[in-house]
Amino acid sequence: MKIDESLVKRLETLSMVEIEDKASMAKDLAEIVEFVEMLNELDTSNVDATFSTLDNSTYLREDEPIKNNVIEEILEHAPKAKDGFFIVPKIIE
């Protein structure tokens, strides 16, 4: 793919972003495309499409509801609390 200033102008129009230095942008985009083309040359024939480094090592637990009193424990440390809520000073009149 050839990256030149006319392509940069088209991208500028499509993205609705003003590009001041079109020549520099064309050079940068050409380098990016060249890098991606290098990646396309990699031999991935021996790599499974579903390859993962995790090997299902994520521990899954049973999702069981547990009754606890976390709210009460937290509110015990609050300066003021009532009916399960923090009581704070009024700051807006």
From Swiss-Prot:
<protein>
    <recommendedName>
        <fullName>Aspartyl/glutamyl-tRNA(Asn/Gln) amidotransferase subunit C</fullName>
        <ecNumber>6.3.5.-</ecNumber>
    </recommendedName>
</protein>
<comment type="similarity">
    <text>Belongs to the GatC family.</text>
</comment>
<dbReference type="InterPro" id="IPR036113">
    <property type="entry name" value="Asp/Glu-ADT_sf_sub_c"/>
</dbReference>
<keyword id="KW-0436">Ligase</keyword>
<comment type="subunit">
    <text>Heterotrimer of A, B and C subunits.</text>
</comment>
<dbReference type="GO" id="GO:0005524">
    <property type="term" value="F:ATP binding"/>
</dbReference>
<dbReference type="GO" id="GO:0050567">
    <property type="term" value="F:glutaminyl-tRNA synthase (glutamine-hydrolyzing) activity"/>
</dbReference>
<keyword id="KW-0067">ATP-binding</keyword>
<dbReference type="GO" id="GO:0006412">
    <property type="term" value="P:translation"/>
</dbReference>
<dbReference type="Pfam" id="PF02686">
    <property type="entry name" value="GatC"/>
</dbReference>
<dbReference type="InterPro" id="IPR003837">
    <property type="entry name" value="GatC"/>
</dbReference>
<dbReference type="GO" id="GO:0070681">
    <property type="term" value="P:glutaminyl-tRNAGln biosynthesis via transamidation"/>
</dbReference>
<keyword id="KW-0648">Protein biosynthesis</keyword>
<dbReference type="GO" id="GO:0006450">
    <property type="term" value="P:regulation of translational fidelity"/>
</dbReference>
<comment type="function">
    <text>Allows the formation of correctly charged Asn-tRNA(Asn) or Gln-tRNA(Gln) through the transamidation of misacylated Asp-tRNA(Asn) or Glu-tRNA(Gln) in organisms which lack either or both of asparaginyl-tRNA or glutaminyl-tRNA synthetases. The reaction takes place in the presence of glutamine and ATP through an activated phospho-Asp-tRNA(Asn) or phospho-Glu-tRNA(Gln).</text>
</comment>
<keyword id="KW-0547">Nucleotide-binding</keyword>
<dbReference type="GO" id="GO:0050566">
    <property type="term" value="F:asparaginyl-tRNA synthase (glutamine-hydrolyzing) activity"/>
</dbReference>
